[in-house]
Design a protein with these regions (language model features):
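Terminal domain-initiation and capping elements
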Residues: 1-92
Length: 92
């Protein structure tokens, strides 16, 4: 932080003022593991192994953060997951 001429503190330009957004995927009793894994790979561009781990986390905990990044990218990922009616939420 630095002070401006009025004595008020300002954030340095290189300090990020906003945390990245997160996509949360919720468990359901409709989709198979293979459907969820395939859609996670498509949406997040992760490996199948990572998608499997995320699918198990969703299954075991009822939900999981499956992606983090800027809001626009999170909206894109969420939209792809919802193509097959998976339930998601974006947190900022």
């Amino acid at each position: 932080m630095q002070q401006n001429p009025l004595g008020k503190e300002e954030l340095d330009d290189d300090v990020q003022t906003q945390e990245p957004a997160k996509v949360i995927l919720f468990n359901d009793d409709v989709h198979t593991f293979d459907e969820v894994i395939g859609q996670l790979v498509k949406a997040t561009k992760c490996t199948r192994e990572k998608a499997e781990a995320l699918a198990w986390e969703v299954h075991n905990n009822g939900r999981a953060v499956v992606f983090g990044g800027d809001l626009n990218k999170c909206v894109e990922v969420s939209s792809i997951l919802e193509e097959i009616q998976l339930m998601t939420q974006i947190e900022v």
